[in-house]
Amino acid sequence: MTSLVSLENVSVSFGQRRVLSDVSLELKPGKILTLLGPNGAGKSTLVRVVLGLVTPDEGVIKRNGKLRIGYVPQKLYLDTTLPLTVKRFLRLRPGTHKEDILPALKRVQAGHLINAPMQKLSGGETQRVLLARALLNRPQLLVLDEPTQGVDVNGQVALYDLIDQLRRELDCGVLMVSHDLHLVMAKTDEVLCLNHHICCSGTPEVVSLHPEFISMFGPRGAEQLGIYRHHHNHRHDLQGRIVLRRGNDRS
């Protein structure tokens, strides 16, 4: 399978501060990669590297031709006094045709919001509008920066269900950043735990194996949510430096 984007031993420094060290990953069509880690771990910097906004100091980046990327930012800041409807907000994207707006909203089950004020949307509704905006680019790769932040568990289930549907329909790759260190989308193909470097990687444990979780969130939640169990062989201090490796007395 041809890669959309691949990073090999990528490192990024800002001044004397090393933010990313020897990071490798591969994004493929139809595959979901979830990136998680603590605050300040370099997740946003890694996303910017994938988007082509940051040039690494070391390592190799390969992109598949003229890659079309749809990006959903972590937060959207709007002036609360600015009269801005969903339709007008989506028209602000360069190259957007007005006839494409309603179909994009309907694709994310948000067609009814087309004339709603952006400032009145809930967290889940805002994420759907931002996702519709990303789809206007007909993306081969969707990059979602903490899409479930501020969304309750039921909203997360619905959003993950939608992302899975879009992934299958478009056969696009998905890079998703998660603020939750353990609860991830169950259909994620690979999870990377980042703390300036890749601490560990693997697949999520499907929540359907846990009857108590099913009883709390129902079978639909169990289908879409998964638990990722970390398997680090080291730990970090408050500055992100490796201070201990298991089996060693010194770092």
Curated annotation (Swiss-Prot):
Q: Quote the record's binding site residues for ATP.
A: G37, P38, N39, G40, A41, G42, K43, S44
Q: Which residues form the ABC transporter domain?
A: 5-220
What GO cellular-component annotations does this UniProt entry give?
A: plasma membrane
Q: Which GO terms describe its molecular function?
A: ABC-type zinc transporter activity; ATP binding; ATP hydrolysis activity
Fetch the SMART domains from UniProt.
AAA
In the Enzyme Commission scheme, what number(s) does this protein have? 7.2.2.20
- Pfam families reported for this sequence: ABC_tran
GO BP annotation list:
response to zinc ion
Primary location class: membrane
- Its topology with respect to the membrane? Peripheral membrane protein
Source organism superkingdom: Bacteria
Q: List the keywords (alphabetical).
A: ATP-binding, Cell inner membrane, Cell membrane, Ion transport, Membrane, Nucleotide-binding, Translocase, Transport, Zinc, Zinc transport
The subcellular localization recorded is: Cell inner membrane
List the catalysed reactions.
Answer: Zn(2+)(out) + ATP(in) + H2O(in) = Zn(2+)(in) + ADP(in) + phosphate(in) + H(+)(in)
- Cited function: Part of the ABC transporter complex ZnuABC involved in zinc import. Responsible for energy coupling to the transport system.
* Assembly mode: The complex is composed of two ATP-binding proteins (ZnuC), two transmembrane proteins (ZnuB) and a solute-binding protein (ZnuA).
Q: Which PANTHER family match?
A: METAL TRANSPORT SYSTEM ATP-BINDING PROTEIN TM_0124-RELATED, ZINC IMPORT ATP-BINDING PROTEIN ZNUC
Family, according to the entry, reads as follows:
Belongs to the ABC transporter superfamily. Zinc importer (TC 3.A.1.15.5) family.
User: What's the name of the protein?
Assistant: Zinc import ATP-binding protein ZnuC
Give the species: Shigella dysenteriae serotype 1 (strain Sd197)
